[in-house]
């Protein structure tokens, strides 16, 4: 935050050059902090090389595949959206090292694209562009777990920001298409869409674009994965929502009061809390409050009520906080980043 607050004293070339350099360095390093990249490849190989639907089959169904050994979630079907899964189908025929390289380069480019779009959105909103871009591009979790580990959240992020930028330019139909495309990478990005819809000048066009994208994705999913695949996709997303990670706000809250972990019977409380906060923020947006800022607060509320939380999930929030009309959201985002760093440090040290 010190760098961001002093951005006015930095030259844009040197500051953005540092962002690009850090992205290149983390892109060139091996994906040592997470194994999700092998899961991405495995789901594509299930579909293309083994003729199995990745929403109804798991890595352990093909024990002889060499990628399976490095997959972390060997018993779990793909939790990712159809657009990303179809992208992994393209990678499946490639040699593994080449496919990893494509994902590493792709996520780095997507992250830099998100930085560039944050800059562009800030200028459109009349807000300082360089601090907003640095707030996103210099976040350590984005660099280490996003770019370094090649997480697909960065593909989702650049599509979300494309939708935001298009909405700010009153290109509402295309904004709806981009927002749905982001949700077809990871469903959590769909949270931005209702705020975007309320804030749009031509809501009907945005809704039409979104519905068209949904229809096209539904047809593509039906052709590629079949009815059982679509059912499996929905079931897996629901199942993932019931998981509990070692560190999350709900889990750590109960640990602070002496419990070993979040009691199963109390897990439904947190989705209810999020639903209430979401309803209040949507109402506030309907009454004229800034929709980008409220989408940011809603994303923070989602992250704080998830029972399954990973460090790189903070990238969902970064650009919305950077573009917000209040410093409070940026400070809250930094505090949440510190919480995630502390939680991961505890895991690594124990």
PLM region spans:
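Membrane-interfacial helix-loop-helix junctions in multi-pass membrane proteins
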Residues: 259-262
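Multi-pass membrane glycosyltransferase architecture that uses lipid-linked
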Residues: 1-235, 241-244, 251, 255-257, ...
């Amino acid at each position: 935050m010190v760098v961001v607050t002093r951005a006015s004293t930095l030259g844009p070339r040197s500051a953005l050059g540092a962002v690009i350099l850090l992205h290149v360095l983390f892109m060139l390093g091996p994906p040592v902090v997470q194994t999700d990249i092998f899961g991405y490849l495995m789901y594509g190989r299930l579909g293309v090389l083994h003729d199995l639907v990745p929403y109804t089959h798991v890595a352990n169904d093909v024990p002889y595949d060499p990628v399976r050994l490095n997959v972390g979630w060997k018993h779990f079907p793909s939790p990712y959206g159809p657009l990303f899964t179809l992208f992994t189908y393209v990678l499946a025929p490639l040699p593994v090292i080449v496919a990893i390289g494509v994902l590493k380069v792709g996520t780095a480019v997507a992250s830099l694209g998100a930085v560039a779009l944050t800059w562009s959105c800030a200028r459109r909103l009349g807000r300082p562009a360089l601090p907003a871009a640095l707030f996103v591009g210099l976040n350590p979790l984005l660099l280490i777990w996003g770019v370094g580990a090649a997480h697909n959240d960065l593909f989702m992020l650049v599509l979300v920001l494309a939708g935001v930028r298009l909405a700010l330019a009153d290109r509402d139909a295309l904004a709806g298409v981009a927002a749905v495309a982001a949700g077809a990478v990871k469903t959590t990005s769909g949270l931005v869409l209702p705020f975007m819809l309320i804030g749009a000048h031509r809501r009907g066009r945005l809704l039409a674009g979104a519905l068209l994208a949904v229809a096209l994705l539904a047809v593509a999913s039906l052709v590629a994965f079949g009815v059982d695949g679509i059912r499996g996709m929905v079931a897996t997303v629901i199942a993932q929502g019931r998981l509990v990670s070692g560190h999350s706000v709900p889990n750590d809250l109960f640990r602070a009061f002496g419990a070993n972990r979040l009691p199963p019977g109390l897990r439904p409380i947190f989705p209810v809390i999020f639903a209430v906060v979401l309803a209040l923020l949507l109402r506030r947006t309907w009454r004229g409050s800034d929709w980008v800022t409220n989408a940011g607060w809603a994303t923070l509320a989602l992250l704080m009520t998830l029972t399954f939380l990973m460090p790189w999930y903070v990238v969902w929030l970064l650009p919305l906080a950077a573009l917000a009309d209040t410093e409070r959201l940026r400070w809250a985002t930094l505090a949440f980043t510190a919480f995630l760093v502390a939680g991961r440090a505890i895991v690594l040290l124990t």
